């Protein structure tokens, strides 16, 4: 049997596709394209959080006006549309872990958790319950057949590359998901929205952290976890106490501005000592990192990660969503997985992701990745930090 444009057997009119509709232009265009091609399209929007603070805020998603926009687009396309209340699930799977991660001194990525749990687990099951052959989203990433399964690839428009946020997608989910925008530049997507007469054609793109009004994540965390706003010391990596802070929630590794001390030297946050409520700062060179240890690894490569050679596997690694993939070596031994960064990186924070690719082109295959549990700095900085932490432990035990 021949395959349709979604690589599924059968004619489009005999193929049901659930489209995850956030109310933005991207997912709306996905619904419009598939409807135009003759697919049996069903729109589903998740209400993910209390939208009171976001109803009049441009750049949110899955709340208030966005739900209404998704409904209007669905109505104009003539497709059924359902709104599912996932607020409790979103709080449990995304918001609470986000706050807990900050309290422990990490810098989390809630979008990965949302994709990993709510969107690509719970919504995927809902799509199956609706009898859909696939779940389509407006993410900028590509997938295509690779043997008996499908593999993920970076999109044509690398300025919109969302593969960093999708590294935790499992093989089973990848096989069921479809990403119709992966081969299109954003400008063309907006042109298609105009052609389709969609009311959201000129709508502003959504922000990454959708549930944080005005981007003030510290307000949300302080409300959920008041201990994150406990004051403490700002300490230089050489041991000097430089001042006080109003809560580690206001800081992240790599930060330079707004540290709150003036010493005449450029200082950066190099570590958050959550146990002792300390913000540890130092010179830029104290941020240089060549090795990161990963947890919760989702490996999509052909060779099982436990079977990697002792010499490791040459890959390209991305440690921030805004940075390109750079040369690295992936290693696994004694139950640990780590990545050696050939050229080094600065400002790597625990809780962030390290995503692995076959190369640095826009056709690169996504090998998966993991969350950064810890990193190793240059030897001198690593020793200074180790000594500082050991002294704090001794003081606490005394």
UniProtKB/Swiss-Prot annotation:
Compartments in which it is found: Cytoplasm
Residues annotated as catalytic: 114 (nucleophile), 210 (cysteine persulfide intermediate)
Disulfide bonds: 114-210
Known catalytic reactions: S-sulfanyl-L-cysteinyl-[protein] + uridine(34) in tRNA + AH2 + ATP = 2-thiouridine(34) in tRNA + L-cysteinyl-[protein] + A + AMP + diphosphate + H(+)
Keywords: ATP-binding, Cytoplasm, Disulfide bond, Nucleotide-binding, RNA-binding, Transferase, tRNA processing, tRNA-binding
Domain of life, per lineage: Bacteria
Primary location class: cytoplasm
Documented EC number(s): 2.8.1.13
Any Pfam family hit: tRNA_Me_trans_C
CDD domains referenced in this protein's UniProt entry, alphabetically: MnmA_TRMU-like
InterPro entries hit by this protein: MnmA-like, MnmA-like_C, MnmA-like_central, MnmA-like_central_sf, Rossmann-like_a/b/a_fold
Gene Ontology cellular component annotations, sorted alphabetically: cytoplasm
Gene3D superfamilies per record: Adenine nucleotide alpha hydrolases-like domains, HUPs, Translation factors
One record GO biological process: tRNA wobble position uridine thiolation
Ranges where the record places region Interaction with tRNA: 160-162
UniProt binding sites for ATP: 20-27, 46, 138
Molecular function GO terms recorded: ATP binding; tRNA binding; tRNA-uridine 2-sulfurtransferase activity
SUPFAM superfamilies: Adenine nucleotide alpha hydrolases-like
Family: Belongs to the MnmA/TRMU family.
Xref: HAMAP family: tRNA_thiouridyl_MnmA (MF_00144)
Name of the protein: tRNA-specific 2-thiouridylase MnmA
Lineage: Bacteria, Pseudomonadati, Pseudomonadota, Alphaproteobacteria, Hyphomicrobiales
């Amino acid at each position: 049997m021949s395959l349709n444009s979604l690589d599924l057997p059968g004619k489009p009119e005999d193929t049901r596709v659930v489209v995850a509709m956030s109310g933005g232009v991207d997912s709306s265009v996905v619904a419009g394209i598939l409807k135009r091609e003759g697919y049996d399209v069903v729109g589903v929007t998740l209400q993910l959080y209390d939208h009171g603070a976001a109803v009049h805020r441009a750049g949110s998603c899955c709340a208030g006006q966005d739900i209404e926009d998704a409904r209007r687009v669905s109505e104009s396309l003539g497709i059924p549309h359902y709104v599912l209340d996932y607020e409790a699930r979103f709080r449990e799977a995304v918001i609470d872990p986000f706050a807990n991660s900050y309290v422990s001194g990490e810098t989390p990525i809630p979008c990965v958790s949302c994709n990993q749990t709510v969107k690509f687990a719970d919504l995927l099951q809902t799509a199956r319950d609706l009898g859909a052959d696939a779940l389509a989203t407006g993410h900028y990433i590509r997938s295509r057949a690779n043997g008996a399964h499908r593999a993920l690839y970076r999109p044509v428009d690398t300025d919109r590359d969302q593969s960093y946020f999708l590294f935790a997608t499992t093989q089973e989910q990848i096989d069921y998901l479809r990403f119709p925008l992966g081969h299109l530049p954003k400008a063309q997507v907006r042109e298609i929205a105009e052609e389709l007469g969609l009311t959201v054609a000129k709508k502003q793109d959504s922000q990454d952290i959708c549930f944080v009004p005005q981007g003030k994540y510290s307000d949300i965390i302080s409300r959920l976890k008041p201990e994150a706003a406990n004051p403490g010391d700002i300490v230089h990596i050489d041991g000097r106490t430089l001042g006080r802070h109003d809560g580690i929630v206001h800081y992240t590794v790599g930060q330079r501005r707004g540290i709150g001390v003036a010493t005449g030297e450029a200082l950066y946050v190099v570590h958050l000592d959550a146990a002792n409520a300390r913000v540890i700062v130092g010179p830029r060179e104290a941020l240089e990192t060549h090795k990161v240890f990963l947890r919760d690894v989702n490996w999509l490569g052909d060779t099982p990660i436990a079977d990697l050679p002792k010499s490791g596997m040459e890959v390209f690694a991305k440690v921030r969503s805004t940075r390109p993939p750079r040369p690295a070596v992936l290693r696994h031994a004694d139950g640990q997985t780590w990545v050696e960064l050939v050229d080094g990186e600065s400002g790597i924070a625990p809780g962030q992701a390290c995503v692995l690719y076959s190369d640095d082109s826009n056709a690169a295959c996504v090998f998966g990745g993991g969350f950064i549990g810890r990193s190793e700095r240059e030897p001198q900085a690593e020793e200074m930090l180790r000594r500082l932490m050991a002294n704090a432990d001794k003081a606490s035990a005394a």
